[in-house]
């Protein structure tokens, strides 16, 4: 009798637990799927480009649980014998929420990670510089946008072996699927055209003009009616009909370094959340009339974004702050942040990523399953050097401290040197500029060029450099202090500083 009662309770628990991850009424699921309340079984995963890690966060208390270390920082990753991953960047997950696919751009790899054990179960190497990967709605295939070439690599959803390639315009940026499972939408990072592909036979059935070439991210509404994509080079976000003839519906001026977009359904309606890296904000738009309804300050260089299984929160990776921010979608304000690795890029929220512990009982038949301490944290490592970075701002000379600085800078520790990443805004479009070190805070004195760059049509740029820069700009170890500045022109012919360092 006792055994029968135990089995009955276990069966009920198993059935309810299975129902939780059968689907969700949030992206990338269908509107008809049930919402999944936030629980300790859920995970937020962020892909970190410079530490080559995946950080794992518990969304209930916004606590970093640890990292999955896929590779090493400099200088180890420069070795000819290096076998780890490089430039960990893109991310997707399977329909059963038991596998995440993590793309490493520099090593041309897709890493398939078991969410229960945090262990890599397979690595598939594809073509040059893949950017993002996602599973089809039935989980039978994984489509990888190979941005350094002109095709989508289609992998078997079970063996992860490449089964075919779909030729698309040069530089595919990302693929997302219609929640009804019919179409794959592929935007481009090098060609001003998005294509629509039938999942069943891999045929292009629609073409949508992009306002500019650089699309990094794309999202579909749960009702399969709209597709939103960002344009990082021009600071725009575009919307087209998710069904034939795939007509363009709207072009929005969202702001410099428009990064990622995702869709949220909650008690107030359905909304698109767009991360604006150059403004350090998330902008919120209604999907029915495209009205902007909120602007949410987030922190430095918001990038990846994904909703919780019930739409009550969205999570945002802060690329130049090495944090994940949690946003309450009913209040549209940041309610918590947690530390992650260096330069988080793509981010996903996976409901029920960790199965309930064996024998766990769904107390009072609620949706909050019991997850014992330490369950689902195997193989995770502490941040270590992945958590070491410094940040500063650049602003026009004479700007007051209370004025918003247009440029954020992050210095990610890599041994004795750092990777510098500057999210530059507030400059003239399409002009050459120089990031330099000056002997004077005003940007005068002796100048040492660091990196030249060209601004995009939105007057913005992402600028990178490597060196012992933190030690120099802080005057550490008795090193004569220098100051980061931006000047118009080139190393050989430049004007006076237009932005100078501000702590």
Language model regions located:
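Low-complexity, intrinsically disordered regions enriched in charged/polar residues
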Residues: 5-9, 243, 421
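Gram-negative bacterial Sec-dependent N-terminal signal peptides
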Residues: 2-20
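N-terminal leader/targeting pre-sequences
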Residues: 364-503
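Generic low-polarity alpha-helical segments
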Residues: 1, 15, 28, 484-485
